[in-house]
A protein has these predicted regions:
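Conserved catalytic core of the tyrosine transesterase superfamily
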Residues: 1-184
């Protein structure tokens, strides 16, 4: 999926296409790196993205704030390239992610963007922004991250909400039962 976005960037025939690709890459990278909700992503203000300290301030449901650290250099680079390319538009709009009319990027635009790249990648499964959130949580759980940390990163007030996102894959389940069961 990401390889298609980067290929589109490398094949961009115009400055406009390049800028769109830079924005789309930044959006997808940030969704996957943070597990944030699409509404949280679209509501980000320029001051919420701190690329000196590599943090994102997210305003979640119920006006709950959380700060997430960006640890992946590719995500940080994607955000820097986007920010440099859209600096004027971001300033005019007041939101970090901007559409071609220099307005706040909408939830629907992000959904359309994801569908477009999924089609280009030949992915037949319906891909939604929520899948990035689910994958974020599941992959962290599979790396043995405590579910309470995942709960905090996702902005859930209840651990039971987090548990919905974190189904254990069959491969991980097998590994646990074979290697960690007290009778083995």
């Amino acid at each position: 999926f990401l390889s298609v976005l980067y290929a589109q960037k490398n094949q961009a025939a115009s400055t406009y296409q390049l800028r769109c690709c830079l924005r789309d890459i930044a959006v997808i990278e940030l969704l996957f790196a943070t597990g944030m909700r699409i509404s949280e992503l679209c509501s980000l203000r320029p001051s919420d993205i701190d690329l000196e300290n590599n943090t994102v301030l997210i305003y979640g449901k119920g006006s709950k704030e959380r700060i997430l650290q960006l640890g992946n250099p590719e995500v940080i680079c994607a955000l820097m390239l986007y920010q440099d390319s859209f600096k004027t538009d971001i300033s005019v709009c007041g939101y970090f992610f901007v559409n071609k009319q220099k307005h706040k990027l909408s939830d629907q635009s992000v959904r359309f963007m994801i569908n477009r790249y999924a089609n280009l990648a030949g992915i037949e499964q319906h891909i939604t922004p929520h899948i990035f959130r689910h994958s974020f949580a599941t992959l962290l759980l599979e790396q043995d991250v405590d579910i309470r940390y995942i709960q905090e990163m996702l902005g859930h007030s209840s651990i039971s909400t987090t548990e919905i996102y974190t189904h254990v894959s069959s491969a991980k389940q097998k590994d646990i039962l074979v290697n960690k069961h007290p009778r083995n």
